[in-house]
Amino acid sequence: MTIRSVVLGCGSYLPQRVVTNAELASRIETSDEWIVQRTGIRERHVAADGEFTSHLAINAARAALANADVDPQSIDLIVLGTSTPDNTFPATAVAVQNGLGIHHGAAFDLQAVCSGFVYALATADNFLRSGSFKRALVIGAETFSRILDWNDRTTCVLFGDGAGALVLDAQQQGGTAADRGVLSTHLRSDGRHKAKLYVDGGPSSTQTVGHLRMEGREVFKHAVGMITDVIVDAFEATGLSAETIDWFVPHQANKRIIDASAHKLHIAPEKVVLTVDRHGNTSAASIPLALDVAVKDGRIKKGDVVLLEAMGGGFTWGSALVRW
């Protein structure tokens, strides 16, 4: 027998305000056609004044707990993937824990930029499989609108705010790819590329928050190869393949990257879950947001094999295979 981290439920939250490409085109030199052609993005959500990353995360966590039909007091681990915490410290996860009325167990943030949710999922999975904890909330939440240079049309059109969450439960399974739960996780990073996607501020370096800076062509050039390599690792570890997975839920950064990755891996287009058009790139929140959409609309069902992947600044990247 093997302990697996089984998904009990999922949830998400999006800020009320929607910013369309047309609105951006009225403020900066861009157009709906230019944005859609290069990214596939049509609109994104932006947090209101006074609405913090913790608020988004708490709402997503509550939705996931309700979907799982579990008592918040049964949660003994919260791992929050975010690059936009409320404060330098304490961890935003602690604010989430308190907001949910949980005063036991452990809660901490994990920062791997757009790979943050996959990193958080892998971390929680390892804690559950080790027996250290029994039930976890894994959250991705971001307010990237707060770190954008709204005069830089190459970056400000790409990102949005939001949060998504999963409830994981440690359960005894048979130890095969037929098990429900997290079947594999693979994480990678290479700091040689850190200057290609970064924020030009920080408490130690500039004592300011800073703005996101990106060499878009360089990111695109590396993304497809890195993503596909770490997915091949997942397939080899589990004996699964592009043919045997049911759904591919990638980080929603750019439709061209998603399409190219699916094509290289021979994943059928109808298996790809796309939400980048309506959410934009929500960094660590993008995968759980997309998962929640596909669960709510009936595509992802119990027993389905779901492939997750992400790549973010650092570079960091990773994959996970989950049987729902």
From Swiss-Prot:
GO terms assigned for molecular function: 3-oxoacyl-[acyl-carrier-protein] synthase activity; beta-ketoacyl-acyl-carrier-protein synthase III activity
Pathway per the UniProt entry: Lipid metabolism; fatty acid biosynthesis
Protein origin, superkingdom: Bacteria
Record GO biological process: fatty acid biosynthetic process
Region (ACP-binding): 252-256
Key words, A-Z: Acyltransferase, Cytoplasm, Fatty acid biosynthesis, Fatty acid metabolism, Lipid biosynthesis, Lipid metabolism, Multifunctional enzyme, Transferase
SUPFAM superfamilies cross-referenced by the UniProt entry: Thiolase-like
Protein location: Cytoplasm
EC number: 2.3.1.180
Active site: C114, H251, N281
Catalytic activity: malonyl-[ACP] + acetyl-CoA + H(+) = 3-oxobutanoyl-[ACP] + CO2 + CoA
Cellular component terms (Gene Ontology): cytoplasm
Class of the enzyme per the UniProt entry, highest EC level: transferase
Comment on protein domains: The last Arg residue of the ACP-binding site is essential for the weak association between ACP/AcpP and FabH.
Subunit (UniProt): Homodimer.
Functional description taken from the UniProt entry: Catalyzes the condensation reaction of fatty acid synthesis by the addition to an acyl acceptor of two carbons from malonyl-ACP. Catalyzes the first condensation reaction which initiates fatty acid synthesis and may therefore play a role in governing the total rate of fatty acid production. Possesses both acetoacetyl-ACP synthase and acetyl transacylase activities. Its substrate specificity determines the biosynthesis of branched-chain and/or straight-chain of fatty acids.
Annotated NCBIfam families: fabH, PRK09352.1
Protein name, as recorded: Beta-ketoacyl-[acyl-carrier-protein] synthase III
